[in-house]
Amino acid sequence: MKKITMNHKIIKKALLIRNVEQAFLDLFSTGNLNGTVHTCIGQELSAIAFAGQLSKKDFVFSNHRCHGHYIEYTNEWHSLVLELLGKKDGVCGGIGSSQHL
């Protein structure tokens, strides 16, 4: 098992996840997202710890609060935003939304 320590990189990633999640809540509250959105605000570090134990050969099946897992595992957030906006360049072609990544 890999040793996990709190460092600048972990804190920076947790803040990135928090900011993306807050942006989703803001978009949802103004009616700019279809369906619903389930954030992982307050659970950012669990996503980072979880993904830190995986290899690129692993398959990930998450729950309905999966944005943090996605961001940490893929190391990107742009296609996640496009997905929740219903755009074809989203991670699931814009049809998966928040719950089906």
Where do the language-model regions lie?
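Cofactor-binding active-site loop characterized by glycine-rich and histidine/acidic residues
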Residues: 22-25, 32-101
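Cofactor-/ligand-binding subdomain signature composed of acidic, glycine-rich
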Residues: 1-34, 56
